[in-house]
Swiss-Prot record:
Keywords in alphabetical order: ATP-binding, Nucleotide-binding, Plasmid
InterPro entries from the UniProt entry: FtsK/SpoIIIE/SftA (IPR050206), FtsK_dom (IPR002543), P-loop_NTPase (IPR027417)
Annotated Pfam families: FtsK_SpoIIIE
Keyword Nucleotide-binding: yes
Name recorded for this polypeptide: Transfer protein TraSA
GO molecular function, one term: ATP binding
Source species: Streptomyces ambofaciens
Positions that bind ATP: G145, A146, T147, E148, S149, G150, K151, S152
Domain FtsK: residue ranges: 127-326
Name of the gene encoding the protein in the UniProt record: traSA
Length: 415
């Protein structure tokens, strides 16, 4: 109600009104009436949410979306809300989100969130909306963050979100497996050292080539086949022929790029070459990369910048220097770099996410303990697919113990 009552005056004070048109002025002059007032953007829809309010505005002639984006801070103070963000929906229509409190202080994900294959909710945005990791839209991602920045919790949320889906999880954890091996029951392949990681990545490259052979055989290119039925990736194949998609999670990628001897340098070059090939060619074969690390710059050697250029999705938790933030957002948005280095140390899990379009937002993943992630992976262990090319890297685990249920209650002894 406060927003509706003060809407016209606030918009005029913030410079978001346009003067009346000539025909309205002429009509008022002919009717001997007062000159009409300036007009603010028209409200198309007003929708209350659990965190605030969403306005959909129709811009007046001469206005653009940048005018609204440039005044969000003034709108925040004028309406007395915690935060205001805006985004352009289509030409001439802007959505303005107002939040009444800091939704990132205590993250509460909605009870029901929209899920689709390869699209999972992982965090909450500062405007109260759910942040999704959509592998079909953004195939490969890079996650950076210093120690104790919440990077591992974000990775756990990814695994927990993917666990119920029909997807093969492949993990490379060179910290001797302390992060990913507790979740091993939901992983189709795991590697805990650079030597095993090299063999695993080369096996993935071989699997990718086999998938392309399958797509080539099932393309169904002929004069009589409509274009819509021609297969170009695994999602165009029939469901009974479609290979299972693979998500590759790499923790502490710097461990794969460091070397001290000539033999380790050769191994490192082969690892980076395999990662670059998967990043360049893996999308159509249903192979998606999720690279995590503390730094990911050119000091890690040749091929790193080529690999980084293929990682469209960027997420940066708290970093210790501006250079690390530039590694994630230097080619995306200078404002995102500034936001990443301003994340305080007492808010682990807060991150800045962006993509190659230049858009970015602050997010925070809900705190998921390792025990909770293990329980989710154990619950969905039966959904772990068998990938023949990766069978040699399948973790060998003992079966889960079956809980014994007594058939009858034991009666207490009586005197």
């Amino acid at each position: 109600m406060r927003v509706l009552v003060r809407y016209a005056s606030v918009m005029e004070a913030c410079g978001l009104t346009v003067p009346p048109s000539r025909w309205r002025l002429a009509l008022a002059r002919m009717a001997n009436r007062p000159a009409p007032e300036s007009r603010p953007p028209r409200i198309l829809r007003l929708r209350p949410t659990r965190t605030g309010l969403v306005l959909r505005l129709k811009l007046r002639p001469g206005q653009d979306a940048f005018d609204v984006a440039a005044t969000t801070d003034r709108l925040r103070h004028s309406f007395g809300v915690y935060g205001v963000t805006s985004r352009e929906l289509r030409s001439g229509v802007v959505e303005v989100r107002m939040t009444g409190y800091d939704v990132l202080q205590r993250v509460q994900m909605p009870a029901t969130a929209e899920t689709r294959p390869m699209r999972i909710p992982v965090a909450l945005r500062e405007d109260g909306a759910v942040h999704y990791r959509d592998y079909r839209a953004v195939p490969h991602g890079l996650t950076l963050g210093a120690t104790e920045s919440g990077k591992s919790v974000y990775q756990r949320n990814l695994v927990a979100g993917l666990a119920p889906h029909h997807v093969a999880l492949v993990g490379i954890d060179c910290k001797q497996g302390v992060e990913l091996f507790p979740l091993a029951r939901r992983f189709s392949a795991l590697a805990d050292n650079p030597d095993t990681a090299l063999d695993l990545l080369e096996a993935l490259v071989g699997h990718m080539e086999d998938v392309y052979q399958l797509i080539r055989a099932e393309q169904r290119i002929s004069v009589a086949v409509p274009d819509a039925e021609i297969a170009a990736d695994i999602w165009d194949l029939r469901e009974d022929l479609r290979p299972v998609p693979v998500v590759v999670l790499v923790d502490e990628v710097a461990e794969l790029a460091l070397f001290a001897t000539k033999d380790e340098e050769k191994r490192r070059d082969r690892i980076i070459t395999a990662l670059v090939r998967l990043a360049q060619l893996g999308r159509a074969a249903g192979i998606y990369l999720e690279i995590c690390g503390q730094r990911f710059g050119s000091e890690l050697g040749k091929g790193i910048t080529m690999l980084r250029a293929q990682l469209t999705g960027r997420t940066a938790h708290r970093v210790n220097d501006e250079t690390s933030a530039n590694m994630a957002f230097g080619d995306v948005s200078p404002d995102a770099v500034l936001a990443a280095i301003q994340i305080p140390t007492d808010t682990p899990g807060v991150a800045v996410t962006g993509d190659s379009t230049g858009g970015w937002a602050r997010i925070r993943a809900p705190h998921t303990t390792l025990r909770e992630a293990v329980n989710i992976c154990n619950k969905h262990a039966d959904r772990t697919p068998d990938v023949p090319a990766l069978a040699a890297f399948r973790p060998a685990l003992a079966p889960l113990p079956q809980a014994r249920v007594p058939l009858s209650k034991t009666a207490p002894a009586t005197a």
